[in-house]
Amino acid sequence: MRRVITIFIVLVINLVLQSTVLQYIRINSIIPNTALIIIISMSLLRGRVEGSVTGFGAGILQDIFFGSSLGYYALLGTLVGYFAGRFNHNYYRENYALPVFLCFIGAVIYESVVFVTGAFFNGYLNYIYFLINIILPEAVYTAIAAVIIYRILFSVNDRIEKSEKHKRRLFSIK
């Protein structure tokens, strides 16, 4: 229960920061996708299920506050969490290369899907322009921010795991 509450608090703080403070560190009107970083980080640290749930939670918050339709970002976040969680067992947690790389690739795919679905409904199809001027710069910015945010989430996860391990030891029958 502690883990769920902690992740919910992290997602709410992210929502507030993304809509306030991060607006002041824009570069050419681009901000890092911190929700995506949280989803991928939690997926790598905890696996597919918790990554999917985190993705759904982050996405539903984005849908409620920023989206035009309920469920779109929730579905995207869930899928990102699931696929990033598949790498959970295949890497050394203290190595930042995989989270940064997945955040870069994830941002490119995520924003491409957002563009393609938006283009489908709006009829705007200049993908190359969008890729060069928005998707790739945002992916780079997201990857850079991932170094800091992953470290924070890593230590939060580590504290929760130690607390859970301690509780299991207290209540185990010998």
Where are the model-predicted features located?
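Terminal, non-globular segments
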Residues: M1-K174
